Regions:
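Active-site neighborhoods of divalent-metal-dependent phosphate/nucleic-acid chemistry enzymes
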Residues: 77-124
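Short, conserved alpha-helical segments within structured domains
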Residues: 43-46, 66, 108
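Active-site regions of enzymes building and remodeling cell-envelope glycoconjugates
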Residues: 134-141
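Residue-level detector of anion-binding/catalytic polar loops
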Residues: 36, 122, 136
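Short, charge-patterned binding micro-sites
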Residues: 50
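Positions that flank functional sites
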Residues: 45, 89-90, 131
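Short, well-structured N-terminal submotif of metal-dependent ribonuclease cores
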Residues: 1-39, 54-69
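Short, polar loop motifs at secondary-structure junctions
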Residues: 125-130
Length: 141
């Protein structure tokens, strides 16, 4: 059985927006993907926020209603699920984010890495930094 995938926000966004600079590598990954791919509440919110942000959308922000339709389009694909916050998530999140210095940019990445690990999923991203968490990653280029 193929391991399921957990794309980060930027992968979902690149898939959703044909004009995105990383749309082609995201689409190439998506077209070859046969396993389940999952959203978390954080990746859902991130996608909805980016789709409705003019600067992220080249001045052409979607309405909230349109953004919901894009998200719904992903969920209508039989490969897409919402992955639950499993009990293991909390301990993993604390371990990945428990640094001895203030590092505000670590919170979201640590959460995404923990969510992928707790759900035994491959974290799919454009960001090489996810490798530092020791979770299984697929870095798109």
């Amino acid at each position: 059985m193929t391991k399921r995938s957990f794309p980060d926000v930027n992968v979902w966004f690149a898939l959703a927006v044909a004009e995105h600079p990383h749309h082609r590598p995201a689409l190439a990954w998506w077209n070859e993907e046969s396993s389940l791919a999952g959203f978390s509440r954080l990746t859902q919110l991130g996608l909805l926020r980016l789709l409705t942000t003019a600067s992220a959308m080249g001045g052409q922000a979607l309405t909230n209603e349109e953004a919901w339709r894009v998200y719904g389009g992903f969920l209508s694909d039989s490969r897409v699920r919402v992955f639950p916050e499993l009990p293991a998530l909390e301990d993993l999140f604390r371990r990945y984010s428990g640094l001895r210095q203030a590092s505000p940019k670590v919170w979201v990445d640590a959460y995404l890495a923990a969510h992928a690990a707790a759900n035994e999923a491959i974290l799919v991203s454009f960001d090489q930094a996810f490798k530092s968490y020791g979770v299984e990653c697929r870095i798109l280029t």
